[in-house]
Amino acid sequence: METLKDLEALKQAPICHFFRDAELERVYNAGKKLTLKKDQVLFSENSVQETLYIILSGKMEVYKKQKQIAVREAGDFLGEMAFLESNPRSASVRAFTDAELLEIDKKAFFKFFAPNPKAVWEILKVISARNRADLDVIVASYQEIRNSREKYR
């Protein structure tokens, strides 16, 4: 019963829309399900892991130096930067609410996602949208600093 609920949640994730039910079940079985309580840390900045996470339920908070960067929800993925670059984690992530996630390692990713151009394209679109949002924040912050400097001249 729990597996059916998880598979249904996984099916809602945009990066999994392209899998047929049997493939989706294989993806799920190749991953590792994690259950986190509110405020429980999934990973910390600078930790070394090469895993990607898909949120099955709940919300996760991405933060750096205790400043919130983003809140991700069911269907979203996270941990992609360290996963793709094989570098330490660039931020920390904790459960914003109780949450369930599917942890995907590189072996499973290359077996199921990499051969699927539509899934890879969806991942690229999400990363691009996140970069665009980050640029908007940077520009707004720069403008705020500039306005503050002019105010005190």
Set out the residue ranges of the language-model regions.
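Cytosolic regulatory regions built on CNB/CRP/Popeye-like sensor folds
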Residues: 1-153
